Swiss-Prot record:
Contains 6 SPKK motifs which may interact with the minor groove of A/T-rich DNA sites. Phosphorylation of this motif may regulate DNA binding. This motif is reiterated in both termini of histone H1 and in the C-terminus of plant H2A, but its presence in the N-terminus seems to be unique to sea urchin histones H2B. There is a cross-link at K144 (Glycyl lysine isopeptide (Lys-Gly) (interchain with G-Cter in ubiquitin)). A motif (SPKK motif 6) lies at residues 30-33. This is Histone H2B.3, sperm. Keywords: Chromosome, DNA-binding, Glycoprotein, Isopeptide bond, Nucleosome core, Nucleus, Phosphoprotein, Ubl conjugation. The nucleosome is a histone octamer containing two molecules each of H2A, H2B, H3 and H4 assembled in one H3-H4 heterotetramer and two H2A-H2B heterodimers. The octamer wraps approximately 147 bp of DNA. A motif (SPKK motif 5) lies at residues 24-27. It comes from Parechinus angulosus (Angulate sea urchin).
Length: 149
């Protein structure tokens, strides 16, 4: 049975454009009507299940913060609010280092951010002893990465 191009929706007289999407259930499943919703012989009268779109996962540094916490204080936990604060802190520091490294790269008329720019950005942003420790840990991480390749 051919379908009519414009069907009326449950609202007052406003025509619905096009046909329903593939996989979406029809409004009414009446055996009198010969559309998608009608029961067909031999099919068992089953409807297709509507697949919901999966929501995008939120990225966070939570698992890494937790691992570091357990290295430093194995018997200490962290609340979700404190984890949120720590995640915001890590994101903020990351953004600051990245923007400073980008500024240094453009000041030196280069197009690629290297480990040298990151190191200089860390030295500029972090105070004294903290900068020294961050640089040494960063150098150690880069060395470990290059040797594992």
């Amino acid at each position: 049975m051919p379908r009519s191009p414009a069907k009326t929706s449950p609202r007052k007289g406003s025509p619905r454009k096009g046909s329903p999407r593939k996989g979406s259930p029809s409004r009414k499943a009446s055996p009198k009507r010969g559309g998608k919703g009608a029961k067909r012989a031999g099919k068992g009268g089953r409807r297709r299940r509507v697949v919901k779109r999966r929501r995008r996962r939120r990225e966070s540094y939570g698992i890494y913060i937790y691992k570091v916490l357990k290295q430093v204080h194995p018997d200490t936990g962290i609340s979700s609010r404190a984890m949120s604060v720590m995640n915001s802190f890590v994101n903020d520091v990351f953004e600051r280092i990245a923007s400073e490294a980008s500024r240094l790269t453009s000041a030196n008329r280069r197009s690629t951010v290297s480990s040298r720019e990151i190191q200089t950005a860390v030295r500029l942003l972090l105070p004294g002893e903290l900068a020294k420790h961050a640089v040494s840990e960063g150098t150690k991480a880069v060395t470990k990465y290059t040797t594992s390749r």
